[in-house]
């Protein structure tokens, strides 16, 4: 098979399992233009201060909400305009999800990293369509998959002509409404040659845990993130918000943006020790 690139570059941001980790962060969904600008600006200021690469993430459509009445987002067209303006204002690359083959070309015209949601990670047509855009692809490992199953998922993208792929661990189903993080997954994913991302906030999600919405245990985000960077990863994925308890989606597992800088500074220390050992 075509081997994935061990180093993936997105603008001036580098994702490599042997380099200092970069951050993918933002609110779960685009709530409004003003909110997106507020969050991107605050995160960019923090990452500039601590000296870490930053990719802004947010979703335009939360297509797998627990309830039909749940807020899904601003939609594709509105999101592309917002993302374009965010890139001009802050100079940061953008990541967002795609759910259908038809969305891939539209999203790729503006967005730098196309993310394949965990529930869709085995959908061959979606993977091939995303790969053919030539954009960087971040594939979330399904909660239902063993880490070694992701090798076949990775092949679908690389054999479609795109070697710029990253694999993202976001927890494994463990009984009803629960996820666990098996840190052995990270070196297994790393052995396939692609940069590995750890999603520290969705890993503490409780899918459907509140009946008509998902719950979460944000008190464990820092613990799991520390463990992941200690093992060695290319990037950390975090959802953050100024008021998570009142966010329209995934509030229980998002961290308060007021806590982000201290968390990153802590993770950078663990990351340094981990990468020093790898060398």
Swiss-Prot record:
The keyword Cytoplasm applies. Keywords: Cytoplasm, Lipopolysaccharide biosynthesis, Transferase. The gene is kdsA. GO terms for cellular component: cytoplasm. It holds the Pfam family DAHP_synth_1. The keyword Transferase applies. PANTHER family: PHOSPHO-2-DEHYDRO-3-DEOXYHEPTONATE ALDOLASE. It comes from the Bacteria. It catalyses: D-arabinose 5-phosphate + phosphoenolpyruvate + H2O = 3-deoxy-alpha-D-manno-2-octulosonate-8-phosphate + phosphate. Belongs to the KdsA family. Signal peptide: none annotated. This is 2-dehydro-3-deoxyphosphooctonate aldolase. Pathway: Carbohydrate biosynthesis; 3-deoxy-D-manno-octulosonate biosynthesis; 3-deoxy-D-manno-octulosonate from D-ribulose 5-phosphate: step 2/3; Bacterial outer membrane biogenesis; lipopolysaccharide biosynthesis. Its EC number is 2.5.1.55. It comes from Bartonella henselae (strain ATCC 49882 / DSM 28221 / CCUG 30454 / Houston 1) (Rochalimaea henselae). One of its GO terms (molecular function) is 3-deoxy-8-phosphooctulonate synthase activity. One of its GO terms (biological process) is keto-3-deoxy-D-manno-octulosonic acid biosynthetic process.
